[in-house]
Amino acid sequence: MYDVKSITSERSNDCGATALKMLLEYYDIKVDLNQLVEECNTQIFGCTGRDIMRVSALHGLPLKAYQCKGEDTVDDVIYADRPGILWWKYRHFVICCGIDDTGRVVICDPDKGRYRLSRSLVASFFSNVVMFNGEPKDFDKKDIKVIDVDFPWE
């Protein structure tokens, strides 16, 4: 499990910028949340994955977006060797922090804080796109592909 500091967003549409702040802080990059909200062009419906990737790179943390297809790809994500930003319920961003000692998946949610879920619940909420700094080891290449520019939700 990865020690990602849970940060709660001030507004519900700030989830993308807040998830990015959590990931940046995990990598010891300190940026004010209000600055990230502004840089991500956060609007009434939030920001896009493209905005998160652009702003993350501006602060020295290039991200790659991966589209995960296939039922078992959720395991590649939750057992990854680093935390990642998950597209969640097709409308939200959260951080996957790995697995705890009881086998539950640890999520840092900008709206609800840190909580633990079963793998099956994560699989039902995960919208098949995750952003990582670099490429995790042991990713199953046949069911996971890098998305360069176009996100499925944009």
Language-model segments: residues:
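Noncatalytic regulatory segments and standalone regulatory/sensor domains
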Residues: 40-47, 78-85, 97-154
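Short beta->alpha connector loops
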Residues: 69-70, 89-91, 112-113
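Beta-rich nucleic-acid/ligand-interaction surfaces
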Residues: 72-76
